[in-house]
Design a protein with these regions (language model features):
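Low-complexity, glycine/proline/serine-rich flexible segments
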Residues: 68-116
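Extracellular glycan-recognition modules
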Residues: 42-46, 55-59, 96-168, 188, ...
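Short, tryptophan-glycine- and acidic/Ser/Thr-enriched carbohydrate-recognition patches
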Residues: 50-78
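Flexible glycan-contacting loops in extracellular carbohydrate-active proteins
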Residues: 215-235
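Localized edge beta-strand/strand-to-loop motifs within extracellular or lumenal beta-rich domains
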Residues: 190-204
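Short, solvent-exposed loop/turn segments at the edges of extracellular beta-sandwich modules
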Residues: 23-28
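Surface-exposed, flexible coil segments in extracellular/virion-facing regions
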Residues: 1-9
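Short, aromatic/His-centered strand-loop micro-motif at the edge of beta-sheets
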Residues: 167-193
Length: 235
């Protein structure tokens, strides 16, 4: 496009390389800049947090979280260096199970997943080898917070001993899906991509594009719509 403020429509979600060329009226000075644009699917996406300088949800539901802090000098830094130069990520500062910061999402109808298929995808880098449980997300009520006293929650955490990762659909004690990764600790200080899938009573964990663990045919489990937390150190 040669327009001053062009509007470009993409028919398919994905990542596209774009080139911006700018010049003055006399064409005596020209600047060219290459970059990438990410186009999200407009259907079925619930949350999208790029964490590029802030905690805003860039998805269609605009579910913006608040920072909750336990202890002194705990916070979430949204200007930490990301895995690619020039980009930022969220750094969750923590010390122990009494001193950490995390994000809390406001209640929203879009978070009422119940037993519908859900995929959660994220990048994490950690070198913390001492925390007993290092949480990434937790959604739904535990037994002490639910009116019926039942677990109706899902969560993902790193552990310092085997199983090194647990992705769980927890319902009525241990009757849910406990998807355990036991191969090796992932607290190696490198970026890794994780995908958690819950569908038709089965759960799957993918690490860097490879299926690493699964828990099959456990039956459909409802998940409470609140609370929803991202990042925490506990226990």
């Amino acid at each position: 496009s040669n327009e001053q403020n062009p509007t470009v429509t993409y028919s398919t979600a994905g990542k596209y390389k774009v080139t911006l060329v700018a010049s003055n009226d006399m064409n005596t000075s020209t600047a060219e800049q290459e970059g990438y644009i990410t186009v999200l699917p407009g259907k079925d996406i619930v949350l999208f947090y790029p964490f590029e300088g802030d905690s805003k949800d860039m998805g269609p539901n605009a579910i913006h979280p608040e920072i909750l802090k336990l202890g002194d000098n705990m916070d979430v830094n949204f200007n930490a260096p990301a895995r690619k130069e020039g980009f930022t990520c969220a750094e969750f500062r923590s010390k122990d199970n009494q001193n950490y910061a995390f994000l809390s999402l406001p209640d929203n109808d879009a978070l009422d997943f119940q037993a519908t298929p859900v995929t959660t995808s994220f990048w994490v880098k950690t070198s913390n080898k001492t925390a007993a449980n290092l949480g990434v997300f937790q959604h739904g009520a535990g037994p002490n917070a639910s009116t019926d006293g039942k677990n109706k929650q899902t969560w993902f955490r790193f552990q310092k001993s085997s199983p090194f990762i647990r992705y769980v659909i927890e319902y009525s004690g241990l009757s849910g899906n406990w998807t355990d990764y036991k191969t090796k600790a992932m607290t190696d200080g490198e970026w890794h991509h994780y995908v958690c899938v819950h569908t038709n009573g089965s759960t799957y964990l993918y690490i860097d594009g490879v299926k690493a663990a699964e828990a099959l045919n456990k039956g459909l489990k409802p998940i409470d719509r609140k609370p929803y937390f991202i990042g925490a150190m506990y226990r």
